[in-house]
């Protein structure tokens, strides 16, 4: 038996996982990462931890994450959950701080880096994902619940904001 399920939003609003109950194997897609940055440009950051709880409730023994090595021991499964939760929580909490301080996007990026870089700066695709991650986290922390669609104009707006003068 193979189950295709939506257990809640996280990486996107409509994340789907594949669960093989007889083998206790979970294909999590980008809801979980291992040794790689989480791409959160289209995420529901506030809701993501509850979705991780729903995944954990399945009690998977092996997880195939969206990026990174397969998690095939109890320790690596626990570590994958902790890592993803920490990435998402650190990102959102630092963005909330930046919004509370009324920082512009460039300043918010610098602030988020002070929290994110020491923990995650070494992982795969971190530098690629971070501008999109911080932009979405600042949006969500500012009250924009649903991600804005990434258009060419929005992409330009983001890069302009990140390069703007302080």
Role assignments for model-derived ranges:
Residues 1-50, 57:
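Catalytic core of the metallo-beta-lactamase
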Residues 36-40, 97, 138:
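Short, well-ordered beta-strand elements within core beta-sheets of diverse protein domains
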Residues 39, 79-83, 125:
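Alpha-helix capping and helix-loop boundary segments enriched in small/acidic/polar residues
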Residues 44, 79-82, 146, 155:
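Acidic, low-complexity intrinsically disordered regions
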Residues 47-107, 111:
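Divalent-metal (often Zn2+) His-rich catalytic cores of metallo-beta-lactamase-fold enzymes
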Residues 100-166:
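C-terminal regulatory/interaction regions
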């Amino acid at each position: 038996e193979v189950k295709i399920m939506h257990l809640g939003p996280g990486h996107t609003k409509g994340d789907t996982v594949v669960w093989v109950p007889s083998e206790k194997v979970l294909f999590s897609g980008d809801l979980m990462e291992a040794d790689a940055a989480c791409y959160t440009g289209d995420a529901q950051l506030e809701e993501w931890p509850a979705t991780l709880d729903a995944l954990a409730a399945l009690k998977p023994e092996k997880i195939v994450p969206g990026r990174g090595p397969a998690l095939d021991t109890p320790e690596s499964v626990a570590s994958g959950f902790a890592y993803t939760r920490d990435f998402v929580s650190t990102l959102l909490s630092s963005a909330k701080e930046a919004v509370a301080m009324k920082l512009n996007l460039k300043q918010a990026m610098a602030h988020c880096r002070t929290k994110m870089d020491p923990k995650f700066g070494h992982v795969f695709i971190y530098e690629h994902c971070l501008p999109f991650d911080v932009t979405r986290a600042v949006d969500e922390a500012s009250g924009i619940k649903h991600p804005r669609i990434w258009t060419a104009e929005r992409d330009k707006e983001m890069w302009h904001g990140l390069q703007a003068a302080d």
